[in-house]
Design a protein with these regions (language model features):
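N-terminal Rossmann-like NAD(P) cofactor-binding module of classical short-chain dehydrogenase/reductase
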Residues: 2, 6, 54, 141, ...
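A glycine/serine/threonine-rich, flexible loop-to-helix segment
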Residues: 67-70, 91, 101-126, 166-167
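Conserved SDR Rossmann-fold cofactor-binding beta-strand/turn motif
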Residues: 95-105, 145, 158-160
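A conserved structural motif in NAD(P)-dependent oxidoreductases
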Residues: 126-137, 148
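Short C-terminal tail/terminal secondary-structure segment
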Residues: 141-142, 153-167
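Catalytic loop of short-chain dehydrogenase/reductase
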Residues: 6-44, 49-91, 103-105, 163
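Short, small/polar-rich loop/turn modules that mediate ligand/substrate recognition or access, typified
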Residues: 90, 95, 152-154
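Short-chain dehydrogenase/reductase
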Residues: 40, 82-83, 138-141, 145
Length: 167
């Protein structure tokens, strides 16, 4: 089962984290992070005998990314939730992981300031000298949802042409 929902109010997304509103922070956390925990709880009875829960993260969870603002701490909480949920759901045979794509030209990403420059920089700097495609992300998600990944849980997997190793 795939969780791919994220949101932060524009006023809080583009500003400093310290200046984010309490309401905006809570809303971003509820929609982008807590919704995954709720999904895990509701999906568990449907996954008798095991299964796979996936969520989508981003490098901004582990490193400061310009113009990513409030979503960085929210995605960090999401990745931490993956580890806790993996521990809780593991005894039922349910694997829990996050997929962290590199920059993708999507409608959601268009809300990030200077995103076109981020795309160009990522393609130039990534060890494979290219951006990832939606098909690349889909292939990893397909693998993670399959029994071929039966021994993988609690992980964040990067599909970003190596961009995350640059620090």
């Amino acid at each position: 089962m795939l969780h791919s929902i994220a949101f932060a109010p524009a006023a809080d997304l583009h500003g400093r984290v310290a200046d984010s509103s309490r309401e905006g922070f809570a809303r971003a956390m509820d929609i982008s992070c807590h919704s995954f925990a709720r999904m895990a709880r509701l999906a568990a009875p449907l996954m008798q005998g095991g299964g796979s829960l996936l969520t989508m993260s981003y490098l901004g969870a582990a490193e400061v990314i310009d113009n990513y603002g409030l979503m960085g701490p929210v995605k960090a909480a999401l990745e931490s939730s993956v580890r806790y949920l993996a521990t809780e759901q593991g005894p039922q045979g349910i694997r829990v992981n996050a997929v962290s794509p590199g920059p993708l030209a999507t409608r959601a990403a268009s809300g990030i300031q200077h995103f076109d420059q981020l795309l160009a920089d990522a393609a130039e700097r990534a060890p494979l000298r290219r951006l990832v495609s939606i098909e690349d992300v889909g292939a990893l998600c397909t693998f993670m949802a399959s029994d071929a990944s039966r021994s993988m849980t609690g992980s964040t997997l990067y599909v970003d042409a190596g961009f995350h190793i640059l620090g």
